[in-house]
Curated annotation (Swiss-Prot):
Family: Belongs to the NAD kinase family.
Segments traversing the membrane: none
Superkingdom: Bacteria
Obligatory cofactor(s): a divalent metal cation
Protein name per UniProt: NAD kinase
Family annotation (SUPFAM superfamilies): NAD kinase/diacylglycerol kinase-like
Keyword entries, A-Z: ATP-binding, Cytoplasm, Kinase, NAD, NADP, Nucleotide-binding, Transferase
Subcellular location: Cytoplasm
Example of a GO MF term: NAD binding
Main location: cytoplasm
Catalytic class of the enzyme: transferase
Location of the active site: D73 (proton acceptor)
Organism, scientific name: Idiomarina loihiensis (strain ATCC BAA-735 / DSM 15497 / L2-TR)
Amino acid sequence: MSAFTKIGLLGKADDRGTQLTLETITTALIHRGFALCLEARTAEQLNLPEEVETLSLPDLGEWAEIAIVVGGDGNMLGAARALCEYDIGVIGVNRGNLGFLTDLDPDEVMTPLLSVLNGNYHVEERFLLSAEVINNGSSSGTGRAINEIVLHSDKVAHMIEFELYVNDHFVFSQRSDGLICATPTGSTAYSLSGGGPILHPGLDAMTLVTMFPHTLSSRPIVVDGNSEVRLKAAFDNDLLQISCDGHVRMTVHPGDDVIIKKYPKALRMIHPIDHNYYHVLRNKLGWGSRLF
């Protein structure tokens, strides 16, 4: 693999541990002669030399070959939704909790990071989902997600009614708390908590998981990744919401359609050469170790 020469660095430096990791990486890379730029809002929170270059996130995406994101999975998701628009690889340093998307240990970050920057890595394409709300035939909002798109009530613990179509084929109507449409990346997030299956990130598929359905026969459905999923809100619902990765929210009125499909651009995840997906699952989910 080709080495990286132009490196972007960003993170939400809201605690001292994250600040130290960002400052350590900055100092080490500048000392070794790498061309480094920090995301401007990140740099404002750090104690760095004045000569450190800074760029806005869109400009960083245009300039850099790889972006290093320091933080938890939430920080990684936010950065990835923006950076997927550019021809840039993304790697994470875990300063959060589980860290499914952030491979590098902050306490031992420089050795594996330098190995990656020198060309010892592999690339994994992760697809995103897009959501569009259609009101009376016109688009009223769009969003995209790395993990999942969720249809739910704007009230707490409130049942809704909707119909599900896949490629314009009617699947079911249902009364439940909502529906989760997740990518393979998101299959270990909210979807997993709702009883959904774990999908290997290399699969071209998405999973549809209903939330607390008012039926005993409801089960998760896995569909082709190129499918178009349409959710139609019942006319007697109150206002509903679409959430993209738990952040971007759009209002859904009674009778609206929500179109969910693969986003045209993918995220280029960069992993260390020894990355093992099943080791990550076993470690993060606390599965048992080998018996023999």
